[in-house]
Amino acid sequence: MKLYLSILILTFWFCPPVFGQPQHVITRYSIEDGLPQQTITGITKDRNGYMWFTTWNGICRFDGHSFVTYRVLPGDSNDLATNRIDDIKIDAHNQLWLLDDENSLYRFSPENSKFDHFASQTAPVQNIFTLSDGDTWVFQTDGRLLRIRPNEETMDCLQILDSSSQVRSIISLVQNQDIIWIIADRGIYKFSKEDGKLTPILSSPNRFYSFRKWEGMFILGSDNGQLYIYDPKKDTHSILKFNTTNPLIRIKAYDSKHFLVIAENDGFFLTEGYQGEGTHYTTSNQLLSNQINALYEDNNQKHIWVAYKNTAMITRIKPFSTYYKHYQLKTQEYNNSQRSLSQDRNGRLWVFSKNEALNYYDEKADEFLLFSISRNSQESRQPRIKKIYFDNQNNLWIARQPKGLIKVSFKNDLFTLSVPDVKGYPSTNELRSIMEDADHNIWVGGKNGDIQVYDKDKNFLGFLNSTGKLSHQAEYLGAIYALLQDKEGNIWMGTRNEGIIKLVPQGKLNFQLKYYKANPADIFSLNCNFIFSLKEDKQGRIWVGTLGGGLNQITKDANGNERFIHSGNKLSDYPSRFSRIKNICIDHLDNIWLATTSGILLCRWSKDKLTYTPIVRNGNAKNSLSCDNVYDIFESSKHEIYVATFGGGLDKLTGFDEQGNGIFKNYSSPQMISNVPLTLAEDNEGNLWIPSENGLYRLFLENDSTEIYDNRFLPEGLLLTDSRACRLSNNEMLFGTDRGLLSIIPQQMKRNSYTSNLIITDIHINGEKKEPSYRSSGITLSHKENSFSINYETLDMKFPNKIEYAYRLKGFDNWNYVKNNRMAVYTNIPKGNYCFQVKSTNSDGVWSNKIKEISITILPSFWESIYGTILYFIIFILIVAISTYILFVIYKLRNRVAI
């Protein structure tokens, strides 16, 4: 299926924060993707996990990959008068109840793909109520209330209220075991399922407008500011009079001691239980208008959010205090339709009104922002929205007005991206080096040649300029590939092709700059200007890794001037093969490990002199270094050496053989680490973090298990670079990217363990589809049906193409890990009893413990059965008997001839 993925809208918390949209991916669906029609009128998710959409040309089911359409066609037997469906509800038996454009009711069974018209309907349907016992209740505009019992063949109907009851609206139905409480505009009725008896419980000359079950009580709002409180256990009621003459049109729970009551055109009340009306909020205190459109109490701070009928404003109120604040919605045109306020599973507050744009509350910016669903940022007007739906994975489904379906999949806010807070700073900001200084400032070197400095909270302080001070004007100093602060407080910067820059402190964030470059006339100058690594050992010696000149050591002459020791002077025995150094690692014994493009060079001290041990790939040795192109070497807190090789993946040094060759364990496999790790870093819990071209890996060293944070988590299009990762003193981890500084808190890096429903969709035997009865009873096949295919899928709507599967035919093979393949194929399976098992990850890559299985029995052929065995035995006996008889006859004939 051809799906159109929009460019991911990124949420980057700039320094200081610049507030953008939540990180998300937009997926657009159209007729080309399988929609029967582009006017979406209803959205819901069934109990299996399928998404259902109603349109003006039938209904369709979506499994995350493809749409299946159900509608009436010429000549078929479906009892559907029109394909224009306007609403949908799903009952406890996963049956779909549909209303067409004339409010005629139909039931659709997904199992047999059949539409049934509700023949007992006598007037347009006003409400559909689906209860947990499987019953569906229907209220018609003529005042009839009907109960429909679950039955696959027919729709058994019982009339509960007729038109003479004078009921004009049903507010709610409340089920309590065998009792159904009917909350109507004329009172409360009690229906017993056991004897079918209907009993009027509470009536009033006034009309009821609202209902809420609160702390075991039934609370009903009525005319003239009257609130009826009914106790179903005691069968008693009381009336609480509010200070208003207007109807109480809506009731919402606030907490266990308070609830909210909206009065028509007279604000709202925050009650103190049943003790009185409590606080009356109107324009006289904190409201902008007395005409309330919607109320919402958030889950985070228990604040009350108020939307109005006649203005595009929102008010936030902190109860039991004088605090309140008004907010302006970002909307291009205002209409007076009903607003809805709700929070998603991440606690984000959304405001929706039909045919307007969508707003959300940004807590850090403390304002409502427009949620953009435009194809590009240059569109002057946002598309209008007809309907929204949040599924249980927090995906936001949007039906556009007039046409189109959009899925918004939100990413967890696990990463923070920091860039210079400078207007016009380029979005391309490829980082090559990161360092935390002694004052906990963060230094960042970029490929574009500037030096960025942030404070410990990652607030941007400025760019280092050639005067040694910070400025908000970027200045080219050289592409900085290495950063080091030595024990004396000096900062050393290694550049690509510009040599070394030394920053000598002259005060707080004020430095004197000294430059060191290769000088052919001075043998004690730097021998190469391409600097890729800087390290200081325990003795205070600074080592320089160059890309072309090998290893340099910085020392001082008798006058205190820096000079460089390298292969051109006192390190004349340095192996020239290892001249291209990518990184330096100094272990706890002060051994120097050089990561080079030609392998590893281990430098050990022997009588104040370096000795060299090459460690390279040996194609004839199974456990040798996996690749000579080494990007990084890292010593863990347990003094274990890990090696990142470009193309060979991650290696761990486990020891040396008798010849001194390194013995390695490799971690690169489809289930573990990428074969292109860029750099290595360890968090405070002893886990290894490995940036790669396809994401950020975490390797749990205790059990060698891995996690990957790829484009499902990272901002879209963000690439990690091979800049050495940095662990801060507060245990945050910093990584370089092509767009800025990426930071994480390792303890907060968790993938969602949500488990979606894994189903076996169908089985094909010799190319023919099997009936779905196998789902409950298993399947028995003849010996001629020993080749089959099984289709399966996990109904995870977030990133369905990222779900991985594994299957096996227990008793025949082992687990097959097949990535995103959703079909298992078996051919020529011998007779026997088997169990097909399949498992999957969720969209975040977390494997589920739930295994879907189905028993499969392949019967033997007649010749393999017990009857065939008996027949074989009989034939054998006959052959033996006949042979014996023939031999006996021959023997007798011979005797006669002899006589």
Regions found by a protein language model. Give the residues of each.
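Cytosolic signal-transmission helices at domain junctions
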Residues: I882-I899
